[in-house]
């Protein structure tokens, strides 16, 4: 059982490293960072508490929103999805990501108080 799991993981890593464009790898690293940051915030909330509740919610909403926006960007700039997003260039997708991210963080900063 464990040998097949190791085989699947190693094959996945080989294919990911060989066939994924560098832009997507960079975006995946950003997604991993956001995921770990959100998990760390949630763990802190469970262990220590949520005394400044608005601050916790703002940080966590920022992580979740940023993750969703980055996943949308990844989907749009993936070369395999080019047929689905014919009218949207990677530069336009990135500009949309920056605009939406700016709006998200303005809302988050407003929520902090």
UniProtKB/Swiss-Prot annotation:
Q: In which pathway does it act?
A: Protein modification; protein glycosylation
- Where primarily located? endoplasmic reticulum
For the keyword Endoplasmic reticulum, the answer is yes
Localization, per the record, is: Endoplasmic reticulum membrane
MF terms (GO), sorted A to Z: enzyme activator activity
The biological processes this protein is annotated with in GO are:
apoptotic process; blastocyst development; negative regulation of apoptotic process; protein glycosylation; protein N-linked glycosylation; protein N-linked glycosylation via asparagine; regulation of protein stability
* Any one Pfam family match given in the protein's UniProt record, by short name: DAD
CC annotations in GO: endoplasmic reticulum membrane; membrane; oligosaccharyltransferase complex; oligosaccharyltransferase complex A; oligosaccharyltransferase complex B
Q: Which residues cross the membrane?
A: 31-51, 53-73, 93-113
Residues modified to N-acetylserine: 2
Q: How does it sit in the membrane?
A: Multi-pass membrane protein
For this UniProt record, the keywords arranged alphabetically read as follows: Acetylation, Apoptosis, Endoplasmic reticulum, Membrane, Transmembrane, Transmembrane helix
Domain of life the protein comes from: Eukaryota
Q: Which residues lie on this side of the membrane: Cytoplasmic?
A: 2-30, 74-92
Residues on Lumenal side:
52
Q: Is-annotated flag, keyword Hydrolase?
A: no
Q: State the oligomer form and interacting partners.
A: Component of the oligosaccharyltransferase (OST) complex. OST exists in two different complex forms which contain common core subunits RPN1, RPN2, OST48, OST4, DAD1 and TMEM258, either STT3A or STT3B as catalytic subunits, and form-specific accessory subunits. STT3A complex assembly occurs through the formation of 3 subcomplexes. Subcomplex 1 contains RPN1 and TMEM258, subcomplex 2 contains the STT3A-specific subunits STT3A, DC2/OSTC, and KCP2 as well as the core subunit OST4, and subcomplex 3 contains RPN2, DAD1, and OST48.
Q: Which family does it belong to?
A: Belongs to the DAD/OST2 family.
Briefly, what is this protein's role? Subunit of the oligosaccharyl transferase (OST) complex that catalyzes the initial transfer of a defined glycan (Glc(3)Man(9)GlcNAc(2) in eukaryotes) from the lipid carrier dolichol-pyrophosphate to an asparagine residue within an Asn-X-Ser/Thr consensus motif in nascent polypeptide chains, the first step in protein N-glycosylation. N-glycosylation occurs cotranslationally and the complex associates with the Sec61 complex at the channel-forming translocon complex that mediates protein translocation across the endoplasmic reticulum (ER). All subunits are required for a maximal enzyme activity.
Q: What is this protein called?
A: Dolichyl-diphosphooligosaccharide--protein glycosyltransferase subunit DAD1
- Species of origin reads Homo sapiens
Gene transcribed to yield this protein: DAD1
């Amino acid at each position: 059982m464990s040998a097949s799991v190791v085989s699947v993981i190693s094959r996945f890593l080989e294919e990911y490293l060989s066939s994924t464009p560098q832009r997507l790898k960079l975006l995946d690293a950003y997604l991993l960072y956001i995921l770990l940051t959100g998990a760390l915030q949630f763990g802190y909330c469970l262990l220590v508490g949520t005394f400044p509740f608005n601050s916790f919610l703002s940080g966590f909403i920022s992580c979740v929103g940023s993750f969703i926006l980055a996943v949308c960007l990844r989907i749009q700039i993936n070369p395999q999805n080019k047929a689905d997003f014919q009218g949207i260039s990677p530069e336009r997708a990135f500009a949309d990501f920056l605009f939406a991210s700016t709006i998200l963080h303005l809302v988050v900063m407003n929520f902090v108080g």
